[in-house]
Amino acid sequence: MSRRLISFDTETTGLYVESGDRVIEIGAVEILDREKTKATFQTYLNPEGKAISEGAKQITNIDDSDLKEAPLFKDIVDDFINFVKGSELIIHNAQFDIGFINNELKLAKSKIKDIRDICSVYDTLVVAKEMFPGQRNNLDALSKRLNIKGYDRTFHGALLDAQILADTYLNMTGGQVSLDLNNTICLLYTSQSPRDSLSSRL
């Protein structure tokens, strides 16, 4: 059996983790033997008083009132860790999501300080830039270029985007492009500030 992969995405109150923005949704989809399984992880999260920015509201269609009864990250952290532990996380613009998840782990006082201590990370944005230099490589543009269909992305959602990303990853690594993707798992997500990453998220 091949290594367990998890396509992963978050939605957040805004772009600036260093300014107190929080995760409001987590979505994850399991991939085994190059096929999506029915195993998924999805939850909305209460951002503990951090207001959702207008930009995030427009993108996600999530309002502050929608999250009043949602669990806190600390209440689901063990379930989340158990779902992803030991996997390779497939993330588009990984530095953004890794920064936010690590912040949530810190605030929850988790024993896991860095998600990369229990998972490896494959950044599809880095790979896409190698495959399609000089082109738009956000998830919308990339999935359209690779003819990923069957999804309504009028609004962003973490689980929806994780499903789209899983299909996109499988297409990217399907052998149709002459590129050694196994050697292109570039961990460059620390080179860009989250405030510069909006165009890569949309």
Please give the residue ranges for each predicted region.
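Hydrophobic alpha-helical segments, chiefly the membrane-spanning helices
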Residues: 200-202
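Conserved small/polar residues in nucleotide/adenosyl-binding loops
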Residues: 189-196
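Amphipathic alpha-helical interface segments used for dimerization/assembly
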Residues: 105, 166-173
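Acidic, divalent-metal-coordinating active-site segment for phosphoryl/phosphodiester hydrolysis
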Residues: 157-169
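Generic alpha-helical structural context detector
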Residues: 126-129, 144, 167-170
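Mixed-charge, glycine-rich, non-catalytic linkers/tails in nucleic-acid processing enzymes
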Residues: 174-188
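Conserved non-catalytic scaffold segment of RNase H-like nuclease domains
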Residues: 1-118, 129, 141-145, 149-155
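Short alpha-helix plus adjacent loop in nuclease-associated cores
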Residues: 121-134
